[in-house]
Amino acid sequence: GIVEGLMTTVHAITATQKTVDGPSGKLWRDGRAAAQNIIPASTGAAKAVGKVIPELNGKLTGMAFRVPTPNVSVVDLTCRLEKPAKYDDIKKVVKQASEGSLKGILGYTEDQVVSCDFNSDTH
């Protein structure tokens, strides 16, 4: 099982971001031009995962980066596990979940893809 983890989400541009540098009511960097910058941001994704997967509640922290791409986001999850695990074993479990209990929710591929290849992906 997972002892603790850090979720780093990489988000595509959203409609709430600025097209050019300007003032922001929240944080100074939220006013920076979205298409020219990688913008660190906060995220509630880690807490949301804990609500959907109760076993992970309180075990994940999160951070986000807004990047200049029009669509598709990704999550990098780094975990400390209760027991040692090999990379190939982790991939096998994730692939099995994508074909079983998380089918239609979690996608898995080892193809050499880039973000726009997922534009019509429903996961």
From Swiss-Prot:
Its main location: cytoplasm. One of its GO terms (cellular component) is microtubule cytoskeleton. Homotetramer. Interacts with TPPP; the interaction is direct. Interacts (when S-nitrosylated) with SIAH1; leading to nuclear translocation. Interacts with RILPL1/GOSPEL, leading to prevent the interaction between GAPDH and SIAH1 and prevent nuclear translocation. Interacts with CHP1; the interaction increases the binding of CHP1 with microtubules. Associates with microtubules. Interacts with EIF1AD, USP25, PRKCI and WARS1. Interacts with phosphorylated RPL13A; inhibited by oxidatively-modified low-densitity lipoprotein (LDL(ox)). Component of the GAIT complex. It comes from Cavia porcellus. The modification S-nitrosocysteine is found at C79. GO terms for biological process: glycolytic process; innate immune response; microtubule cytoskeleton organization; neuron apoptotic process; peptidyl-cysteine S-trans-nitrosylation; positive regulation of canonical NF-kappaB signal transduction; positive regulation of type I interferon production; protein stabilization. Belongs to the glyceraldehyde-3-phosphate dehydrogenase family. It catalyses: D-glyceraldehyde 3-phosphate + phosphate + NAD(+) = (2R)-3-phospho-glyceroyl phosphate + NADH + H(+); S-nitroso-L-cysteinyl-[GAPDH] + L-cysteinyl-[protein] = L-cysteinyl-[GAPDH] + S-nitroso-L-cysteinyl-[protein]. The [IL]-x-C-x-x-[DE] motif is a proposed target motif for cysteine S-nitrosylation mediated by the iNOS-S100A8/A9 transnitrosylase complex. Its EC number is 1.2.1.12, 2.6.99.-. CDD domains: GAPDH_I_C (cd18126). Glyceraldehyde-3-phosphate dehydrogenase activity is inhibited by fumarate, via the formation of S-(2-succinyl)cysteine residues. The modification S-(2-succinyl)cysteine is found at C79. D-glyceraldehyde 3-phosphate binds at T14, T43, G44, R66. Coiled coil: none annotated. ISGylated. S-nitrosylation leads to interaction with SIAH1, followed by translocation to the nucleus. S-nitrosylation is induced by interferon-gamma and LDL(ox) implicating the iNOS-S100A8/9 transnitrosylase complex and seems to prevent interaction with phosphorylated RPL13A and to interfere with GAIT complex activity. The modification Deamidated asparagine is found at N57. The record marks H11 as: Activates thiol group during catalysis. The modification N6,N6-dimethyllysine is found at K26, K47, K59, K92, K95. Pathway: Carbohydrate degradation; glycolysis; pyruvate from D-glyceraldehyde 3-phosphate: step 1/5. There is a cross-link at K18 (Glycyl lysine isopeptide (Lys-Gly) (interchain with G-Cter in SUMO2)). This is Glyceraldehyde-3-phosphate dehydrogenase. PANTHER family: GLYCERALDEHYDE 3-PHOSPHATE DEHYDROGENASE, GLYCERALDEHYDE-3-PHOSPHATE DEHYDROGENASE. Has both glyceraldehyde-3-phosphate dehydrogenase and nitrosylase activities, thereby playing a role in glycolysis and nuclear functions, respectively. Glyceraldehyde-3-phosphate dehydrogenase is a key enzyme in glycolysis that catalyzes the first step of the pathway by converting D-glyceraldehyde 3-phosphate (G3P) into 3-phospho-D-glyceroyl phosphate. Modulates the organization and assembly of the cytoskeleton. Facilitates the CHP1-dependent microtubule and membrane associations through its ability to stimulate the binding of CHP1 to microtubules. Keywords: Acetylation, Apoptosis, Cytoplasm, Cytoskeleton, Glycolysis, Immunity, Innate immunity, Isopeptide bond, Methylation, NAD, Nucleus, Oxidoreductase, Phosphoprotein, S-nitrosylation, Transferase, Translation regulation, Ubl conjugation.
